[in-house]
Amino acid sequence: MPRHIRQLFSACLATLTVSVLMSGCAWLPPQACLPPSRIMVSAEMIFGRNIGDRPGISESAFANFVAREITPRFPDGLTVIDGDGQWRDGVRNVDVRERAKVVLITFADDAQKRADLVAIADSYKRQFSQQSVLTKVGNACVSF
């Protein structure tokens, strides 16, 4: 099986696993938050920085991506954190490690904002030849 097919399969399997695990998450009832907190959507997006097996997405390229794709969709704010990620390539039976960027976004629940998360991930995959962007979405009690 060609390597790119194996990698795609591994990424799809990881995405499916996260989706199944997240499907059991319960929504918080409004009374679950203590004042002055309120329920908002909390999203974490994890962007790998390798292209293939090699480092390839620079700090400036990622900063430009945030400025063009994320900030216009979420102008109220976001947080970017550096990370080190790893995942198991079951086909090659090796651990793959890479630098990552974690983007945290909190927003009032809105169908368009949820669609924006998908658009951001799709844009990153297209622009940087990525197989996937891990996106985790849930409710959180938030106060500012």
Q: How would you describe each model-predicted region?
A:
Residues 20-24:
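C-terminal motif of bacterial Sec signal peptides marking the signal peptidase cleavage site
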Residues 30-35, 89-93:
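Short beta-strand/turn micro-motifs at beta-sheet edges
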Residues 93-144:
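Helix-rich interaction surfaces within compact, conserved domain-sized segments
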Residues 15-19:
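Classic N-terminal secretory signal peptides
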